């Protein structure tokens, strides 16, 4: 029984789904691995490093697909790749079902089982497979680094003979995995950090990292049973906007991370709020692909509004692909270990297993 993986479009996606470390782990389950030639050369990982642990290489992606029962991907297959997929094979990756619904339906017509790992249930048994957490954590970190690069001022307070440099002030909107890492990173770099979230329960997490929590008074519970944020009422949005009017005038950098699963990102910073920031300030919108939290944010653009930089560069994983690939590949290995039956020597699609049933595209 073979697991395969092919090269992504490197200009758009630098991550890989299998590293030499996870290849060794997958093979230890009793599986074979097929990879496309020069699979991770762009990351400085040579084919020999894979071959040393028992991986077989093919010259073309179609050969890999034809010789593999399960295909690991990072992103949704291209139209050309879909044509080469075998019937009754298995596809695992991050496929953004709401965005790629038609493409995924086309694949399922070929009797292919698709598992999209961003649909994993939030249960303890699935934590080692949680691709959203592993990748969002890195995105939150990198968003702070990129914002500071664009800020053009020092971040920590510095006391010098020439005078005192004040600490930069950073506001994080959304205190999920990406937001909490953004808080921690900005704090370590010496910034004064505050954060806000629709979930009142996140107050303790923000404060544990040294951030100040900006609380919007609310009566409704805006947290799902799975711990995600829910859509807020118009009354709540008005209160949130009033709170942010004061915050936007004081902060130098804003990191936007607020998302609602299966829905467009909530628009939290309108044109008026963006323009309240000082000239030279920076807004990084991590939610830009889902519609964006901030006005003026556009995918893969840096827009300058009244001297304020609004950054919408997507897929920050391309800025640290080695680390992102390492974590993602480990997530995939954990999923395969759960899916593969050593006794049957085959993949076991057990719909009574919540991990399998929730991630399977039907």
Please identify what each model-predicted range represents.
Residues 2-106, 110:
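An N-terminal-biased, well-structured beta-alpha scaffold segment characteristic
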Residues 98-124, 264-315:
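Rossmann-fold NAD(P)-binding glycine/threonine-rich loop
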């Amino acid at each position: 029984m073979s697991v395969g993986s092919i090269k992504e479009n490197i200009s758009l996606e630098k991550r890989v789904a299998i590293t030499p470390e996870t290849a060794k782990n997958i093979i230890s389950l009793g599986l074979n691995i097929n990879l496309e030639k020069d699979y991770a050369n762009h990351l400085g990982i040579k084919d020999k490093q894979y071959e040393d642990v028992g991986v077989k290489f093919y010259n073309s992606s179609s050969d890999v697909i034809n010789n593999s029962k399960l295909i690991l991907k990072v992103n949704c297959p291209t139209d050309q790749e879909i044509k080469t997929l075998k019937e009754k094979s298995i596809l695992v990756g991050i496929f953004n079902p709401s965005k790629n619904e038609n493409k995924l339906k086309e694949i399922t017509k070929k009797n292919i089982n698709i598992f999209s790992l961003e649909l994993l249930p939030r249960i303890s048994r699935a934590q080692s497979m949680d691709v959203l957490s592993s990748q969002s954590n890195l995105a939150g970190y990198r968003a702070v680094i990129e914002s500071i690069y664009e800020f053009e001022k020092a971040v920590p307070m510095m006391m010098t003979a020439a005078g005192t440099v004040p600490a930069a002030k950073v506001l994080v909107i959304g205190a999920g995995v990406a937001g909490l890492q953004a808080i921690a990173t900005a704090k370590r770099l010496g910034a004064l950090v505050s954060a806000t979230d629709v979930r009142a329960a996140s107050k303790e997490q923000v404060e544990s990292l040294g951030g100040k929590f900006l609380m919007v008074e609310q009566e409704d519970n805006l947290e799902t049973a799975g711990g995600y944020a829910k859509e807020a009422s118009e009354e709540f949005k008005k209160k949130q906007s009033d709170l942010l009017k004061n915050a936007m005038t004081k902060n130098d950098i804003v990191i936007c991370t607020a998302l609602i699963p299966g829905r467009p990102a909530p628009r939290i910073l309108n044109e008026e709020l963006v323009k309240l920031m000082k000239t030279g300030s920076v807004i990084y919108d991590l939610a830009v692909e889902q519609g964006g939290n901030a006005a003026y944010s556009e995918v893969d653009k840096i827009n300058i509004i009244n001297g304020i930089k609004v950054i919408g560069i997507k897929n920050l994983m391309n800025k640290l692909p080695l680390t992102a690939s390492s974590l993602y590949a480990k997530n995939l290995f954990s999923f395969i270990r759960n899916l593969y039956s050593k006794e049957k020597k085959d993949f076991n699609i057990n719909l009574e297993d919540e991990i399998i049933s929730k991630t399977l595209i039907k």
